[in-house]
Amino acid sequence: MFLIYLLVQTAESSWLSKTAKKLENSAKKRISEGIAIAIKGGSRRRRSVGEEDAIPSHIEVNKFFLRKPAKEHI
C-alpha cells in the first residue's frame, strides 16, 4: 500500500511541477511582451474575451435589444 502511495505522490508532484513551469513561462512571456510594447510606446493589448465584438457590427443595436423573443416550441 505504501508503494502505491509513493508512486501516486511522485506522479502527482511531477504533473504539478510541469503545470507550474508552464504557468511560469506563460507569465514571463506576457511580462516580456508588455515591456516590449511599453518600450515601443504602442497601445497595450488586453487578453480578455469581453473585448471581442459582443454584438456583430452589421446589426443595429436597437433592433438587437428590442427584438421579440422567439416562441417556444413544445
From Swiss-Prot:
Statement: the UniProt record of this protein carries the keyword Secreted: yes
Domain of life: Eukaryota
Keywords: Antibiotic, Antimicrobial, Secreted, Signal
Gene Ontology, cellular component aspect: extracellular region
Transmembrane segments: none
Signal peptide: 1-13
Example of a GO biological process term: defense response to bacterium
Tissue spec: Expressed in the body wall, intestine, uterus and ovary.
Keyword Signal: yes
Induction or repression: By bacterial infection.
Prosegment location in residue numbers: 45-74
Localization per Swiss-Prot or TrEMBL: Secreted
Protein family (similarity comment): Belongs to the cecropin family.
Function, as annotated: Has antibacterial activity against several Gram-positive and Gram-negative bacteria. Is weakly active against yeasts. Acts by a nonpore mechanism.
Name used for this protein in its record: Cecropin-P3
Source organism: Ascaris suum (Pig roundworm)
